[in-house]
């Protein structure tokens, strides 16, 4: 028997960690949070961003040499990990090897030859320039 409103709502609404359509067809997540009518707050968006950044930073667990890069170049890899997931960015084996060797112009060109570059457009061009130059873009 539920002993709080929280427990009752969890029972009645259920817990959904991925978006779903509720009984009226509204996109919903969590415990009955209607994304279409309520959305999320700024604090919730920042919390999600912080969680996603922590996940992106885990790329360093697989690339210990990343800490030797200057901040702008290191953040190119983090940005890509944020977008693609850690495993996705680890699939850029040639690019990452070129970065590790300090061959940034070639690494940037390799980034731009990828399917990812076609998908994200200007983002890839900006990040490739940042990788090449070591300057924030």
Task: For each feature predicted by the language model, list its residue ranges.
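Short hydrophobic/aromatic-rich motifs at helix boundaries and adjacent loops
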Residues: 29-31, 66-67
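Mid-chain, well-packed structural core segment of small domains
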Residues: 66-93
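Conserved interaction-surface patches within small, structured recognition/assembly domains
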Residues: 60-65
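Long, amphipathic alpha-helical surface segments
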Residues: 1-18, 24-26, 33-51, 56-59, ...
């Amino acid at each position: 028997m539920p002993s709080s409103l929280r427990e009752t709502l969890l029972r009645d609404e259920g817990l959904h960690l991925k978006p779903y359509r509720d009984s009226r067809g509204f996109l919903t997540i969590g415990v009955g949070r209607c994304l279409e009518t309520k959305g999320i707050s700024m604090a919730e968006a920042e919390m999600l961003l912080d969680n996603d950044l922590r996940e992106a930073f885990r790329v360093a667990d697989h690339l210990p040499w990343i800490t030797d890069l200057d901040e702008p170049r290191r953040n190119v890899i983090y940005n890509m990990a944020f977008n693609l997931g850690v495993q996705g960015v680890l699939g850029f084996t040639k690019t990452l090897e070129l970065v590790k060797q300090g061959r940034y112009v070639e690494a940037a060109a390799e980034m731009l030859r990828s399917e990812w570059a076609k998908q994200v457009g200007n983002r890839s061009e900006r990040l490739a320039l940042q990788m090449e130059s070591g300057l924030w873009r």
